[in-house]
Amino acid sequence: MRIAVSGGGTGGHIYPALAFIKEVQRRHPDVEFLYIGTENGLEKKIVERENIPFRAIEITGFKRKLSFENVKTVMRFLKGVKKSKSYLKEFKPDAVIGTGGYVCGPVVYAAAKMGIPTIIHEQNSLPGITNKFLSKYVNKVAICFEEAKSHFPAEKVVFTGNPRASEVVSIKTGRSLTEFGLKDNQKTVLIFGGSRGAAPINRAVIDMQEELKTRPYQVLYITGEVHYEKVTAELKGGKAADNMVTKPFLHQMPEYLQSIDVIVARAGATTIAEITALGIPSVLIPSPYVTANHQEVNAKALSQHDAAIVLKETELSGEKLIAALDKIVMNEETLKDMSERTKSLGVPDAAARLYSIMEDIKK
């Protein structure tokens, strides 16, 4: 069996693709994969690290206003389609899966026009331009939020959830927080502003550090590598709380999530998939800098079920953040109830569901 995969730009498009690849490899050890992305994108480094064959096309995203740059983007798209067709003719895949980001546009479009069975996977509640365009041509559209359904042809839509969920629940033995000098037997909050960090979240944490010193819970705080030196300097200036450990980045984060009681994070699709799969209550701070404000819609999908507290970035402060944490962590009943509600929204078998759709369209 041969499968071509495309998706990139951000980890939110790449990690679901890798989780799906692992699921297929588990079922078919002799499967062959080809990943098509961009030369300069995040996907190249991540995919090649996993020893998956990688081919590149040149493509950029559309600007959301009329510009000459969009004319060039159309030209790159057409060139990308031509290049993708040559890769696909050579590889001869049984199916092609696109996981979003503009890079998968030419690849999946080319595959559909060649009559190869195709699926797109939409991680967010509000779909991006690329997947909306591709939905007219593909066999199936896999979604992670019911809110996304209305944006696609109804007869093509299948709810699968995000394969990243399957990956985090498959980790049987998590790693100990004692690696960071934290206690294994104490309630723990993970604060994480995304791979690049988030300055407004960092400011709120700095502002709440004095209050945090009096709390019976501990914090593992990931600043993002760009912000680490500045943040740690400010924290030390305020004599950082003993019950908080600060790190620039956390590699293999899923391996630590089983030891976390509450998470403070953005509301990206991958984060939502991970916390719902494991039943981790959350304080979500949606990024206002994303397309169509989709993170706010992602967050609402949890908060409307009382599975998360949502704080808007414009209203964020140290006082509000620690109050939200106290509300969850300091009340055992609330913590348990939110954990159950969060877990009820998870789809731990998402990768298997996506695999099943692929098998169906191949027939």
UniProtKB/Swiss-Prot annotation:
Q: What is its main location?
A: membrane
**Taxonomic superkingdom:** Bacteria
UniProt cross-references to InterPro entries, sorted A to Z: GlcNAc_MurG, Glyco_trans_28_C, GlycoTrans_28_N
Q: Which GO terms describe its molecular function?
A: UDP-N-acetyl-D-glucosamine:N-acetylmuramoyl-L-alanyl-D-glutamyl-meso-2,6-diaminopimelyl-D-alanyl-D-alanine-diphosphoundecaprenol 4-beta-N-acetylglucosaminlytransferase activity; undecaprenyldiphospho-muramoylpentapeptide beta-N-acetylglucosaminyltransferase activity
Record has Lyase as a keyword: no
Q: What is its EC number?
A: 2.4.1.227
The terms describing its cellular component in GO are: plasma membrane
- A Pfam family (short name) is Glyco_tran_28_C
Localisation per UniProt entry: Cell membrane
**What pathway does the UniProt record associate with this protein?**
Cell wall biogenesis; peptidoglycan biosynthesis
Q: Which family does it belong to?
A: Belongs to the glycosyltransferase 28 family. MurG subfamily.
Q: What is this protein called?
A: UDP-N-acetylglucosamine--N-acetylmuramyl-(pentapeptide) pyrophosphoryl-undecaprenol N-acetylglucosamine transferase
Native species: Bacillus velezensis (strain DSM 23117 / BGSC 10A6 / LMG 26770 / FZB42)
Q: Gene encoding this polypeptide?
A: murG
